[in-house]
Amino acid sequence: ALRAGGRRAVGMKPVASGCTLGVDGWRNDDALVLQAASLPTPAYAQVKPYPFPAATAPQIAAAQVGVRVQMAPMQAAFEALAASADVVVVEGVGGWMAPLADGFEQAQLARALQLPVLLVVGLKLGCLNHARLSERAILDDGLQLAGWIGNQLVPQLDYGSEYFELLQRSLRSPCLGLLPHGD
């Protein structure tokens, strides 16, 4: 949407788990999609400073390969991306309350990069609780919550429209849209 509006926008996934090893190193499908959707096209290492093979929580994936996720590499990658684009969209890692390392939370990353937060809510059973708790945690962390987007995870969900309507009524932040399944 940013690019369609004429903005130079790039994506970043600071920590990527579930990577596969190829001739060019560790690669993650989500990070590759972000790289392909970015304009200008950034270096892959800037899109994804921390690649991990295990498809699990970032702190666990990092520990399995003896790495401690730290702010400096992510800050440097973000600054390089920001120097070449109007907007850098940073994808979250494992959910708002998933720690990046001992004593290093998602909120610290968002605060250091001076980013507003956009909550993406996967529409499924349990999404009402998840979204309300996440919104509360983001606001309690003192961050700007720009709004939320509903994400249709499956083509047909029993009570999907009811979930979406209830989210619109119960969340304090504005709904910025609904992503149809497959987009």
Place the predicted regions along the sequence by residue.
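N-terminal phosphate/diphosphate-binding loop that engages ATP/GTP or pyrophosphate donors
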Residues: 1-68, 72, 77-80
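Conserved catalytic-core segment of NTP-binding enzymes
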Residues: 4, 80, 87, 92-178
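Active-site donor-binding loop signature of nucleotide-sugar glycosyltransferases
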Residues: 14, 180-181
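Surface-exposed, flexible loop/turn segments at secondary-structure boundaries
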Residues: 17-20, 125, 156, 183
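Short, surface-exposed amphipathic charged segments that create phosphate/polyanion-binding patches used
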Residues: 62, 162-163, 183
